[in-house]
Each structure stands twice: as structure tokens, then as C-alpha cells.
């Protein structure tokens, strides 16, 4: 029986589907430049640069004003509220610079996490209050997609059934509100890499989480063709002593997705989860070469793993513009190649690209 109360019109569905497919077309992925003021401050502190709005603006200007050919690698950029309204040195809005390159503009809309009482320090996501109005304003101001991040951890009795169900339902509710306002939802249920668990444990938990998320999305009448998934790769915990190859990570990851993610979803854009730039690229490449059916585009939505080398090259100095932009373009191209299974590892002498970017209990 046809749904008695359709959530979206055929025109709304068409627009959402086209935007989602455009973001992940032909090896394109997402630059996650939605770090909060505090998180960006931590990054700047490591290169001994003061955390001021101007310094944050200057670094992001370098990323957004690279050669237009970046649009062959980057299909979308997720911005933080501050960044959506910032301008380059000539007074042009960043969002307009990106749109002129053919890059879709997105926005982070969750408001962080809050404790779930009665659990082992588990959390749920904040930000549903007033979300529809904020979505409408961001859509008016040029955003066409948005991100909502839920955090689940592997620990003693974690993630609990309550945490999985609560976060799945919150992700689904947000996705529905986004779509009602013409924004493609980037659904991000992150099983964080904190801990000493092995890869098999992570796969088990990831499958349980994704199954719950897609059940909730169905319950909330979310149009899957107009969404993208931003999951963790299936990896061992950061403190696990056993090491796994990219091929092992790929097989576990694609198996988990194959068991839980409907083929209607146009694209899966992995988060980097604190991996080094090079490891994030190698794992993505192996995932695309994995000999299992892959009905979705398998791409990237990286923050640290696209920016670490560029940030190190910049060092807060205007004269390092060329080196900064070259470092960013190099990583963007490498990940675009990996999204097509065409990346060739040549060995890296760049310490920034091979350095672990892991931060315990990482928050945006």
C-alpha cells in the first residue's frame, strides 16, 4: 500500500538525489572543514599559531582558493557556522568561492554530545531543538547538505543497547528534518577507535550500529537515495597490539557494509578516525579494490587526513601559501585516486602524511 502521508514530493526527492550523487561522482569526496573553534585551536596550537578568527580564516582561505581543478577530487565541503559566513581577502564569501568551483557546500548542524544517564559514560547527540529553522536558514544561505555526528564507543558493556537505539533514532530524526528543508543528510554514526579491541570486535559492533541506523531511517521515512553515509572503517582499537593490513581492513569494512547498508544509498564517505593521511588513503584504496559487491560509491569525508600536511606546511606564514596549497592538492588527488581504486603508494618522505592523527575521545 502506498504511504498515506508522503514525507517528500517527487521534486524534493529528485533534488536530494541529484545533490547526493553529485558529491560522490567520479572519485570525488568530501573535505570536512567543520572543526569547531576549540578543535581548530588545538590544531593551530601544534604549529604554534594563535587561535584567532583571522588565523582560522587565513588557513581556510588557502584551502578554498586552490586551483579549480580541485573540484575533480572534492565534491563537497562541510563548513562550521563561522566559516559559512567568512570571506577571502577580497571580500568574497568562502561559500561562493566553493560554488563557483562546482563544489557543493555543506554545514555541521549537531551541537555536540550529552551524557546518557545510566550508561558507562555513553552519549547522545544534541541539537534537535530549533533544527528545522536552522536548516531553513542555512539552505537560504547556500548550504545543500549537512552533517550530524553520533559517537559510540567500544568498552566494557559498550555500546549499550540504549546508546545504539538512542543515537540511531536521533540520526534518523535529524535526517528527516534535513530532507524536509532541502538538505542532503550526511549520516555519521562513528564507532570511535579508542580502546584495545581487535578488528573483529569492531566489525561486530559496526554491523549492530549500522543495522540499527538503517532501521531507524526507514521508520522515519528518510529517502535513502537522498542521503550519504559517513561511517568509520572497521579497524582495531588504537591501543590494540595486533596490526592489520589495508586488505584486511577493507574486507572487514565492506563485509560490514554489505550486511547492513541498502544499495539505495548512493555513497559511503568514510571518516578517517585519526589515521595518518597515508593510512587513510591506503585503506580507502584497498576498500575500492575489495573483491566483494559494492553497489555504492565508496569515497572519503576527511578532515585531519586532508589537512595535516597542509597545516604543517603553512605554519601560520603567508609566504608558505604555495607549499600549503600543493600539500592539500596532493592529498585531495591521492584520495580521489583511492576512491577509484587507482592509488599507487610511492613511499612517503613527508613525516606529516605518515604521522598518526589519533586523539582520544575526539570531538569536532
From Swiss-Prot:
Enzyme class, UniProt record, top EC level: lyase
Chief site of localization: cytoplasm
Modified residues annotated as Phosphoserine in this record: 36, 132, 272, 276, 299, 301, 309
Domain of life of the source: Eukaryota
Alphabetic keyword roster: Acetylation, Cytoplasm, Cytoskeleton, Glycolysis, Lyase, Phosphoprotein, Schiff base
GO-annotated biological processes: fructose metabolic process; gluconeogenesis; glycolytic process
In-chain residues carrying the UniProt-annotated modification Phosphothreonine: 39, 119
Positions with a binding annotation for beta-D-fructose 1,6-bisphosphate: 43, 272-274, 304
Annotated GO CC locations: centriolar satellite; cytosol
Active-site residues, as the UniProt record annotates them: 188, 230
Keyword hit for Cell membrane: no
Function of the protein: Catalyzes the aldol cleavage of fructose 1,6-biphosphate to form two triosephosphates dihydroxyacetone phosphate and D-glyceraldehyde 3-phosphate in glycolysis as well as the reverse stereospecific aldol addition reaction in gluconeogenesis. In fructolysis, metabolizes fructose 1-phosphate derived from the phosphorylation of dietary fructose by fructokinase into dihydroxyacetone phosphate and D-glyceraldehyde.
Family (UniProt): Belongs to the class I fructose-bisphosphate aldolase family.
Subunit structure: Homotetramer. Interacts with BBS1, BBS2, BBS4 and BBS7. Forms a ternary complex with G6PD and TP53; this interaction is direct.
More info: In vertebrates, 3 forms of this ubiquitous glycolytic enzyme are found, aldolase A in muscle, aldolase B in liver and aldolase C in brain.
Protein name as annotated: Fructose-bisphosphate aldolase B
Amino acid at each position: 500500500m502506498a504511504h498515506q502521508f508522503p514525507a517528500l514530493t517527487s521534486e524534493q526527492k529528485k533534488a536530494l538525489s541529484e545533490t547526493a550523487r553529485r558529491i560522490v561522482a567520479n572519485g570525488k569526496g568530501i573535505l570536512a572543514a567543520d572543526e569547531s573553534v576549540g578543535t581548530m585551536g588545538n590544531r593551530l596550537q601544534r604549529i604554534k599559531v594563535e587561535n584567532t578568527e583571522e588565523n582560522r580564516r587565513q588557513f581556510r582561505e588557502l584551502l578554498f582558493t586552490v586551483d579549480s581543478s580541485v573540484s575533480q577530487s572534492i565534491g563537497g565541503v562541510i563548513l562550521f557556522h563561522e566559516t559559512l559566513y567568512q570571506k577571502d581577502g577580497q571580500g568574497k564569501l568562502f561559500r561562493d568561492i566553493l560554488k563557483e568551483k562546482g563544489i557543493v557546500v555543506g554545514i555541521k548542524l549537531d551541537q555536540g554530545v550529552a551524557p546518557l544517564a545510566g550508561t558507562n559514560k555513553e552519549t547522545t547527540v544534541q541539537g534537535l531543538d530549533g533544527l528545522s529553522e536552522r536548516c531553513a536558514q542555512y539552505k537560504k544561505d547556500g548550504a545543500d547538505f549537512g552533517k550530524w555526528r553520533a559517537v559510540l564507543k567500544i568498552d566494557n558493556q559498550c555500546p549499550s543497547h540504549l546508546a545504539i537505539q538512542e543515537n540511531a533514532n536521533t540520526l534518523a530524526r535529524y535526517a528527516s528534518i534535513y530532507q524536509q528543508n532541502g538538505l542532503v543528510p550526511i549520516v555519521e554514526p562513528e564507532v570511535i577507535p579508542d580502546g584495545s579491541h581487535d578488528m573483529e570486535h569492531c566489525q561486530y559492533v559496526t554491523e549492530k550500529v549500522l543495522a540499527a541506523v538503517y532501521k531507524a531511517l526507514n521508520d522515519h521515512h528518510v529517502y535513502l537515495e537522498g542521503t550519504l553515509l559517513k561511517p568509520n572503517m572497521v579497524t582495531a582499537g588504537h591501543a590494540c597490539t595486533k596490526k592489520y593490513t589495508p586488505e584486511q581492513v577493507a574486507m572487514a569494512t565492506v563485509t560490514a557494509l554489505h550486511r547492513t547498508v541498502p544499495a539505495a544509498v548512493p555513497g559511503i564517505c568514510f571518516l578517517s578516525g585519526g589515521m595518518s593521511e597515508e593510512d587513510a588513503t591506503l585503506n580507502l584504496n584497498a576498500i575500492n579494490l575489495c573483491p566483494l559487491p559494492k553497489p555504492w560509491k565508496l569515497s572519503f569525508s576527511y578532515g585531519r587526513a586532508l589537512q595535516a600536511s597542509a597545516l604543517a606546511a603553512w605554519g601560520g606564514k603567508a609566504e608558505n601559501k604555495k607549499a600549503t596549497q600543493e600539500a592539500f592538492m596532493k592529498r585531495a588527488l591521492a584520495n580521489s585516486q583511492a576512491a577509484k581504486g587507482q592509488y599507487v603508494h610511492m613511499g612517503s618522505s613527508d613525516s606529516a602524511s605518515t604521522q598518526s592523527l589519533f586523539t582520544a575521545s575526539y570531538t569536532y
